[in-house]
Amino acid sequence: DRTVTIHASPETVFRFFTDSARWAKWWGAGSHLDPRPGGQIHITHPGGIESAGEVVSIDAPRKFVFTYGFVSGTPIPAGSSRVSITLSADPAGTRLTLVHELPDAAARDEHVQGWRFQLSLFANVVSDEVNANGARYIDLWFDAWAEPDPIARRNMLEEIAVSELRMPSLSRC
């Protein structure tokens, strides 16, 4: 089992398992999926290595299950293992738990580093999408604090801040 916290809502995280373009962002160019039970999954790894499988089940935004293996058959044949990804709400965003059912300990050991890398990459790809407008929000934040009218300043800040954030003072942070 592998667990990682993703700083985004479960709904946002889940889209990366049901949108082929987002799937390719964390698996690599040429990777794609047909997001429905029975739909095909294809992953293009560096060096021309390919993996394939199919979607087993989708329970949005909680669980995504698919089969997995290598087109070459080594170390495991295409579609011969099962990957279950479970998402749950977490105070920091989403807790993602991945379970990869493999035929033996040797196959499991061969995938430990790969999943560690993929989940780290996944967290970064989701973060990049969630924070895509970060620079714009920073500019808007400074524009708001440069606004001399306190009512206009509050309105500007409320436009860009999360709803849980309340400004105790209109004259300072």
List the predicted regions and their residue ranges.
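Hydrophobic/aromatic beta-strand elements that line small-molecule binding cavities or substrate pockets
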Residues: 2-4, 52-57, 81-88
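A solvent-exposed, acidic/Ser-Thr-rich amphipathic alpha-helical stretch
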Residues: 10, 29-44, 51-53, 59, ...
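Short acidic-aromatic low-complexity motifs
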Residues: 7-11, 130-160, 164
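Intrinsic-disorder/low-complexity, polar/charged segments enriched in Ser/Thr/Lys/Arg/Asp/Glu/Gln
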Residues: 1-3, 40, 50, 63, ...
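Hydrophobic pocket/interface hotspot
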Residues: 13, 23, 41, 55, ...
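Beta-strand/loop substructures that line and gate deep hydrophobic ligand-binding cavities in soluble
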Residues: 67, 71-124
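A short, structured loop/turn motif at beta-sheet edges
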Residues: 10-11, 56-62, 86-95
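Hydrophobic ligand-binding cavity/cleft-lining segments
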Residues: 1-32, 134, 152-153
